[in-house]
């Protein structure tokens, strides 16, 4: 056990986490050069394309150190993006230490800070590493000072390396062995193993990645999942080197996989504890908070016969993604679908893209909303995540919207732009600290504004230098109203949205204008209106197509023409009473893209 080191890498997006892990694998000979592929651990196509890490992965490497001993390094990859901070806290729970990788050109960013504090809260040893020193703009001295100043850990003798060229990678391995403590645990105690992650394999069933805290798990052992109380047999146990390699047992302190032929993912929920069926442990391991979805959206299959496939796809995906929440929903405009809860907008995009890609579904998503706390006139409090569930205005005593605390790190030349953006988003400034060239600003912002397009706008006003990290703090009373879209006097439930009263004019106008371009002309006029309660605030009309009924009249008897025109008018009026308008898919998407 003295020779085991469990660690993960914390870094901001694009600071070279995945490249560094490739180098570590290469140096330790986990894969032959032919199998070496860049970003080995980002196994999803989507991860590769966007260049981000989404799922936590693990690798076990054998490293022969300079002192002649062979160490077993268990390395758990973590995502860097704010929406996946939950995946990070899980990965950290399985480690004794973390490498804090910072880009020597860019310096510390908000994300890194947040994850680093998570690690320090869990009493992990954090080892700073300066990456990308091969770049011309690298300034390791300044960045080391920045780490000490902002994060508050000693960084003067931090290892300097370049994962791309391979410089300094050996030093990184030596530092891991020297600075990260070996696991503590009792090999003779009853088994306690933490499930770090589980995913579904079409051939093997559920594969769980576990960290053995106490005891050991052998192939063929009967074990019990503590939250469900069900017993299973371990058909296979082993490690990833990154390839799956079977072993006979996993010992205390090791990280590896267990396959027990489970058919359904919820049989081994992430963050749960495994113990032996006979004389097992009494209490589960600490270290997991159920994560709450922050953003909800309705998702519907474009053709209704895809509904079953869609449900299966969601079930499979939720095996893989512990933070996904969904429940059935039906809409008069879009048919049957699901209301899905996400951690944030990036999570939402990725889930939707994975559904469309991996399961060949065609989906349509309604505008994302956050959860509102509504106090009714009869004194009860309800939580609403769907605009069409909102009670009538006269039954609402007060509406409260979720407020987040956003920590933004930004170079000082862009500070003005960022403050302007935060004010426009109805934010209140809480704190501002200068660290050398960077400024750390703290704002309280309404979550609804943050989930819409805040991140993109923040990046564009600061030329990509600002970084953001946010968490929910409380509900605050706010003047929120529901904006309905009426088409020929009928409410379209899928287009309703909850917005602040100060935005309704501007938003309503933009919406009806946009809808006017997208709804095809019919044989009668279509009125598109935006309404709040019973008050109409904007309207536009899609004009009718008409046939030239007077074309066949020679000569000019005006009463004949009038008769024909009046007859046409009558017909249009009748049509309007019975006709119904198909709202095309593009119109729903337009609502989402309104901000751009």
Swiss-Prot record:
Supply the alphabetized keyword list. Cell inner membrane, Cell membrane, GTP-binding, Hydrolase, Membrane, Nucleotide-binding, Protein biosynthesis
Tell me if Electron transport is a UniProt keyword of this record.
Answer: no
Q: How does it sit in the membrane?
A: Peripheral membrane protein
GO-annotated cellular components:
plasma membrane
Q: What is this protein called?
A: Elongation factor 4
Q: Which CDD domains match?
A: EF4_II (cd03699), EF4_III (cd16260), LepA (cd01890), lepA_C (cd03709)
Enzyme Commission number, as recorded: 3.6.5.n1
GO BP terms, alphabetized: positive regulation of translation
Catalysed reactions listed for this entry: GTP + H2O = GDP + phosphate + H(+)
Please report the organism this UniProt entry assigns to the protein: Shewanella sp. (strain W3-18-1)
The record's section on SMART domains has:
EFG_C
- Judging by the UniProt lineage, the source's domain of life is Bacteria
Q: Which InterPro entries match?
A: EF-4, EFG_III/V, EFG_V-like, EFTu-like_2, G_TR_CS, LepA_C_sf, LepA_CTD, LepA_IV
Keyword Transport tagged: no
Q: Listed GO molecular functions? A: GTP binding; GTPase activity; guanosine tetraphosphate binding; ribosome binding; translation elongation factor activity
Q: What does this protein do?
A: Required for accurate and efficient protein synthesis under certain stress conditions. May act as a fidelity factor of the translation reaction, by catalyzing a one-codon backward translocation of tRNAs on improperly translocated ribosomes. Back-translocation proceeds from a post-translocation (POST) complex to a pre-translocation (PRE) complex, thus giving elongation factor G a second chance to translocate the tRNAs correctly. Binds to ribosomes in a GTP-dependent manner.
Domain tr-type G as annotated: residue spans: 2-184
